[in-house]
């Protein structure tokens, strides 16, 4: 499983990028994208998914 | 004020009301990520015409920021301060803040570095801020009671998790106080920004003022909430209103005697460029900036020499004017609105003014009390009636308007609304003109000093 970012709602603040413990998030062109191969949903590292937890926009960083 | 403190603030427009007539700041939007949510903030929308903290048109990488700072430094001689003030938090988005400051400081060593932060991640970076010679820090503190904070902050992100409610506000409060104390201990000047939210924290800000004064805050800036449904902020959508100019002034007056107040804030955008009250940001968007500008400090150097020469003259005239008004010992007070482009003089045309600076002449002397934003009366050479109606409304409570030039038509319309306007004192120093005006008004000119 992985998380994804709903690009139309994303403000591109980039907080998720530097909170992600797996380096799974990067800015590709005009949007932030989560690499599903790298995303671990923070299992074993943090109790709560860091990207969704830090995201300022409701329902923008969600389970894929 | 001791001379060491004066040295620190004399060319920082935000930390010194006097300096803001001469010096300019620029903000670079390199730190878009934020670790808290505030009910008055929404980072999703931008409009070039909107003057609102947190709003920017383009986010920059540290390299792009360096390009922009060099280009502005070459063109804007008044530039003295580089700030990072959002749209996110300069301490949370730390790597970008640090990289930007390091690059700019090596290129332009004499520029003052300044950040604005919510304080949550501040304590962990105070030592590095001191090491990088960041001389001025602004912390936004809206409460010292988490029960009040809960109404302003829906959540914070701290220690890898999201906190809500009173828990969130309590952590934020503790970090803010700790950060402020740490900065004071290192001799870094702090300004506290507070957003006045009627019915939520307005009277509570009296308590905030006491707390921050005790912890060494240099300046307290109480700003009105900007709230409009079109901005899409939580407060905008729930109909929470901002205070009007008179409510804000009443709170400012109650805070007199506590931590020193900042009254000349313009609540500028997080990518503003230029003197306070003007924003030249649109002239310096990335597509207007050379790819590899080379820093040329000649204009800034020449300007500083001019300011050093004229400043003492201005200060002397100002002090004399204030003393004259105070010694006249008149009970009544005079509310004066001034159109100015800077330099401490009445040098803006009425029709071109985007704001009026408000001064009060009273028994205590001449005091700057704030400013009123307006839509300029003249668009492309002729006046617009709708704009004039807006200006008259914005000048509520003003006795006299001073400007460099004014036409007969707007002058008459102002008079009908009970506001006098004159260009008699055009290009004079502001305080000297107000002093002369005060003497005429109350009949205390030396030749007829009977009152």
Curated annotation (Swiss-Prot), chain A:
UniProt GO BP: nitrogen fixation
Keyword Ubl conjugation: no
Keyword tags: 4Fe-4S, Electron transport, Iron, Iron-sulfur, Metal-binding, Nitrogen fixation, Plasmid, Repeat, Transport
Binding site for [4Fe-4S] cluster 1: 10, 13, 16, 55
Classification via Pfam families: Fer4_7
Cofactor(s) required, per the database record: [4Fe-4S] cluster
Cofactor binding note: Binds 2 [4Fe-4S] clusters.
Domain named 4Fe-4S ferredoxin-type: residues: 2-30
The protein, known as: Ferredoxin-like protein in nif region
Residues involved in [4Fe-4S] cluster 2 binding: 20, 39, 42, 51
Cross-referenced Gene3D superfamilies: 3.30.70.20
Disulfide bridge partners, by residue number: none
Organism: Sinorhizobium fredii (strain NBRC 101917 / NGR234)
Record gene name: fdxN
Molecular function in Gene Ontology: 4 iron, 4 sulfur cluster binding; metal ion binding
